[in-house]
A protein has these predicted regions:
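Extended alpha-helical scaffold and adjacent linker segments that couple domains
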Residues: 1-346
Length: 346
């Protein structure tokens, strides 16, 4: 037995998986449309994708994008357990069935369209790299609580239509494993894995930034991207945040206000009773405790009390008093920011 090499692998896959690929004219048109797209992208994609030979590779690999077959054959195929051609055929058969069942429209089957939420497909990858990567996929790439699909949903527009964040995360995952040394990918490669007609090329860099900010196992270094089973800084910070108590947040807020309030007013932070605020001609700024942010009625009641009373009597210099209270949404955002700040300091 001698392994299949080069363009020959595309022919083997075509014959094994499909009895009939339809009109050859369609195949050539699809190859030409991708080739035209790649000419427009210039240096944003690998140089070989702009060569005539690459258009021919697309024709040979149709309906798969050659990049998908290459990453499976060259990277995943380097695992002794993968069985190269057999492994590629097994995986692609599952991928085709999944796309057919989901009625996903695309001229070519690209890496970004591989559905890692499909358990049969997922198992084909996991069995070569270890069960610990189940949690990586579930946290970041595919599943009801995964972060990449949530980014697509929250961003809407092209993100939601084409599954941009999920597609990029999936493509990077496929590039992250190999029996050899290379275990990452680059932005130009990611564009090849994702872009097709209708997807703006500029969205890729923006989406990568969002993955870097929000995913837990997505690692980037010197414009190289990969998934690892070690958490990145985002996850470390989230773990630290869980140890930060509400009391500590409140104490930090008190300390920050106290050190930044200036001298234009006499400042009174979170007074409990009216007698905590003197009745004199000095300008006074009163900040109500954060607890009042969630109870506007009680907040108004307490502010009125401070205006009316001073100790056991009535307040004379009401016009020197200013009372501020946080709104609940403001305090919620402020608390989140302070929690993250304290977590980073640890």
């Amino acid at each position: 037995y001698s392994p299949v090499e080069g363009v020959e692998i595309y022919e083997v896959i075509r014959k094994r998986l499909f009895e009939n690929l339809g009109d050859e004219r369609i195949r050539k048109e699809v190859a030409q449309s991708y080739f035209d797209l790649y000419q427009k992208l210039g240096t944003d994609i690998p140089s070989e994708a702009k060569e005539i030979e690459y258009r021919e590779r697309i024709e040979h690999s149709y309906p798969f994008h050659p990049e998908l077959i290459d990453v499976l054959y060259e990277r995943w195929g380097s695992f002794p357990t993968f069985q190269r051609t057999r492994g590629v055929l097994r995986l692609l058969a599952e991928i085709v069935a999944d796309l057919y069942n989901r009625k996903i429209p695309s001229p070519l089957i690209q890496s970004s369209l591989v559905n890692l939420e499909n358990q049969a497909i997922r198992r084909e990858f996991i069995k070569h790299i270890g069960n610990e990567f189940e949690s990586v996929i579930a946290a970041d790439i595919a599943g009801k609580n995964a972060k990449a699909p949530k980014i697509d949903k929250d961003m809407g527009s092209e993100y939601a239509t084409y599954g941009i964040a999920t597609g990029i995360a999936t493509s990077v995952f496929l590039y992250s494993f190999s029996g050899a040394a290379r275990k990452e990918t680059t932005l130009p490669r990611i564009r090849i894995a994702l872009l097709r007609e209708g997807i703006p090329s500029t969205i890729v860099g923006d989406a990568i930034g969002k993955l870097e900010e929000e995913l837990w196992y997505f690692h980037s270094e010197k414009k190289q991207y990969a998934f690892r089973n070690q958490p990145n800084l985002n996850r470390v910070i989230v773990d630290k945040e869980e140890t930060i108590s509400d009391l500590r947040i409140k104490e930090k807020l008190y300390e920050s206000i106290q050190s930044n309030c200036g001298k234009a007013f006499d400042v009174y932070l979170w007074p409990e009773i009216a007698s905590d605020i003197p009745d004199n001609k000095s300008l006074k700024l009163v900040l109500l405790s954060p607890e009042y942010a969630y109870n506007p009625e009680e907040s108004n009641k307490r502010a009125s009390e401070f205006f009316e009373k001073a100790g056991t009597g009535f307040r004379v210099y009401k016009n020197t008093l200013f009372v501020l209270a946080l709104e609940s949404a403001q305090y919620l955002n402020l608390s989140k920011s302070l929690k993250r700040f304290l977590a980073i300091l640890e």
